[in-house]
């Protein structure tokens, strides 16, 4: 335990919170170009083919991001917007692609929760 004098000289060091999305560099979203679009399998109790993309951001960092929703039109060289948010059963996937912006089209035939998948209101 430090003495009063040691605290006066040095003081307590603040515990800094580690960012869960360091590649965004404190921005809410970042633009990037798809380098590779592929599927992968989730961790132990779950089973599926999850759609993910390797994205090179405008700041030069390359990240793995998840493509939400059913069906997508992304391929290599597609320009996408990514946001933070991890996928629990995919290790190393810390970002989501935002549907309905830039080259990522919204989910077709989506009726509920449309704003999250970039779908316009059906007529």
Curated annotation (Swiss-Prot):
Pfam (any one): Ribosom_S12_S23
Keyword field contains Transcription: no
Gene for this chain: rpsL
UniProt-listed InterPro entries: NA-bd_OB-fold (IPR012340), Ribosomal_uS12 (IPR006032), Ribosomal_uS12_bac (IPR005679)
Family listed: Belongs to the universal ribosomal protein uS12 family.
BP GO terms, sorted: translation
Known function: With S4 and S5 plays an important role in translational accuracy.
GO cellular component, one term: small ribosomal subunit
Species assigned in the record: Syntrophobacter fumaroxidans (strain DSM 10017 / MPOB)
Residues with 3-methylthioaspartic acid modification: 89
CDD domains: Ribosomal_S12
Protein name, entry field: Small ribosomal subunit protein uS12
Molecular functions per Gene Ontology: rRNA binding; structural constituent of ribosome; tRNA binding
Gene3D superfamilies: Nucleic acid-binding proteins
Keywords, alphabetical: Methylation, Ribonucleoprotein, Ribosomal protein, RNA-binding, rRNA-binding, tRNA-binding
Quaternary structure, from the entry: Part of the 30S ribosomal subunit. Contacts proteins S8 and S17. May interact with IF1 in the 30S initiation complex.
């Amino acid at each position: 335990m430090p003495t009063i004098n040691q605290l006066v000289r040095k003081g307590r060091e603040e515990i800094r919170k580690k960012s869960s999305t360091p590649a965004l560099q404190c921005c809410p979203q970042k633009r990037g170009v798809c380098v590779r679009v592929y599927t992968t399998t989730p961790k132990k109790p779950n089973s599926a083919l999850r759609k993910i993309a390797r994205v090179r951001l405008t700041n030069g960092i390359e990240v793995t991001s998840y493509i939400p929703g059913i069906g997508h039109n992304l391929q290599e060289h597609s320009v996408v917007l990514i946001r933070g948010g991890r996928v629990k059963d995919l290790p190393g996937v810390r970002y989501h692609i935002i549907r309905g912006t830039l080259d990522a089209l919204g989910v077709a035939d989506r009726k509920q929760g449309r704003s999250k998948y970039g779908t316009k209101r059906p007529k």
